[in-house]
UniProtKB/Swiss-Prot annotation:
Organism: Enterobacter cloacae
Name of the protein: Imipenem-hydrolyzing beta-lactamase
Catalytic activity: a beta-lactam + H2O = a substituted beta-amino acid
InterPro entries referenced in this protein's UniProt entry, alphabetically: Beta-lactam/transpept-like, Beta-lactam_cat, Beta-lactam_class-A
Similarity comment text for this entry: Belongs to the class-A beta-lactamase family.
Coiled coil: none
Length: 292
C-alpha cells in the first residue's frame, strides 16, 4: 500500500469519527436546550441522568447537583431489606407486629393489616410500591439502623452522595440549600443500576427487586408516561409536598434493547409551589430521545 493511499484512508477514518462526534454533540446540545426550556417554564430546577446500559451512552443535566430525596429513598430501603435477607440477617417471612401509634400519615397497607401484622417482605414491598410511611419507619427503626444505617448501606454499595438524616415525615421539608435527606440524579441512577442490574443482589433477590419496582403504583404520570406502552418500567417516586419537589427513577426495559436507567429530580424555590408530574415525564422523554 502506497503512503498516499494509507494517508487517504486515515484521513477518511478521522473525518468519519469527527462527523460522528459532531452528530452526537449536536444531539446532546439539542437535548440540553430542551431541558433548559422546560426548566424555564417550570420555574425551578430539574436534574436528569439517563443511561443506555447497552451502548453506554448517557445524558445528563444538573446530574451532580443535590435534590431532596422525598420518598424516593424507599426504593433503596427495599433493596437493603433484600440484601439483609440474602446475607441471612433478615427473614422476609418474619411477621412484623405493630400498633396504629407506629403509623404515620399515608400508611395505606400497614393500616389495612394492623390487626395481624405483615411479613417483612410484604412490608418492604409496601414501602416501595405504595410509599407506605408506616412500613418505612418500622423497617428503618427495627431492621436498618435508622437514617444513619440507611446511609451506611448506600455507602456499602459505592454511593458517596446519598444521605438520609431524618425519618418520615420530617424529611420532606425540601428547603432550598438544605443538604439533609438529599442525593444527586447521577448517584441515584448509578445506585439503581447497581442494585437492579448489578451483582450486589443475587439473581433471586434481584428478580424480586425488579418485580417490586415493576409493581410500583405511584408513578403512572411520571417516567412511565414518557415511554411507549409496550415498554416495561420499574420505578420509585418521591413527592415532598413542599417547594414543588417531586422525583422519579426507573429501570426501563424497551423492546429489543438493553435496559435504560432514568433519574429525574425537580424542585422549586417557593414553599407553596406544586409539583408537576408532566415536567418529570417530559424531562424523561427528552433524556430517552437523546440516548438513541
Amino acid at each position: 500500500m502506497s503512503l498516499n493511499v494509507k494517508q487517504s484512508r486515515i484521513a477518511i477514518l478521522f473525518s468519519s469519527c469527527l462527523i460522528s462526534i459532531s452528530f452526537f454533540s449536536q444531539a446532546n446540545t439539542k437535548g440540553i436546550d430542551e431541558i433548559k426550556n422546560l426548566e424555564t417554564d417550570f420555574n425551578g430546577r430539574i436534574g436528569v441522568y439517563a443511561l443506555d446500559t447497552g451502548s453506554g451512552k448517557s445524558f445528563s443535566y444538573r446530574a451532580n447537583e443535590r435534590f431532596p430525596l422525598c420518598s424516593s429513598f424507599k426504593g433503596f430501603l427495599a433493596a437493603a431489606v433484600l440484601k439483609g435477607s440474602q446475607d441471612n440477617r433478615l427473614n422476609l417471612n418474619q411477621i412484623v407486629n405493630y400498633n396504629t401509634r407506629s403509623l404515620e400519615f399515608h400508611s395505606p397497607i400497614t393500616t389495612k393489616y394492623k390487626d395481624n401484622g405483615m411479613s417483612l417482605g410484604d412490608m418492604a414491598a409496601a414501602a416501595l410500591q405504595y410509599s407506605d410511611n408506616g412500613a418505612t419507619n418500622i423497617i428503618l427503626e427495627r431492621y436498618i439502623g435508622g437514617p444513619e444505617g440507611m446511609t451506611k448501606f448506600m455507602r456499602s454499595i459505592g454511593d458517596e452522595d446519598f444521605r438520609l438524616d431524618r425519618w418520615e415525615l420530617d424529611l420532606n421539608t425540601a428547603i432550598p440549600g438544605d443538604e439533609r435527606d438529599t442525593s444527586t440524579p447521577a448517584a441515584v441512577a448509578k445506585s439503581l443500576k447497581t442494585l437492579a442490574l448489578g451483582n450486589i443482589l443475587s439473581e433471586h433477590e434481584k428478580e424480586t427487586y425488579q418485580t417490586w419496582l415493576k409493581g410500583n403504583t405511584t408513578g403512572a404520570a411520571r417516567i412511565r408516561a414518557s415511554v411507549p406502552s409496550d415498554w416495561v418500567v420499574g420505578d420509585k417516586t418521591g413527592s415532598c409536598g413542599a417547594y414543588g419537589t417531586a422525583n422519579d427513577y426507573a429501570v426501563v426495559w424497551p423492546k429489543n434493547r438493553a435496559p435504560l436507567i432514568i433519574s429525574v429530580y425537580t424542585t422549586k424555590n417557593e414553599k407553596e409551589a406544586k409539583h408537576e408530574d408532566k415536567v418529570i415525564a417530559e424531562a424523561s422523554r427528552i433524556a430517552i430521545d437523546n440516548l438513541k
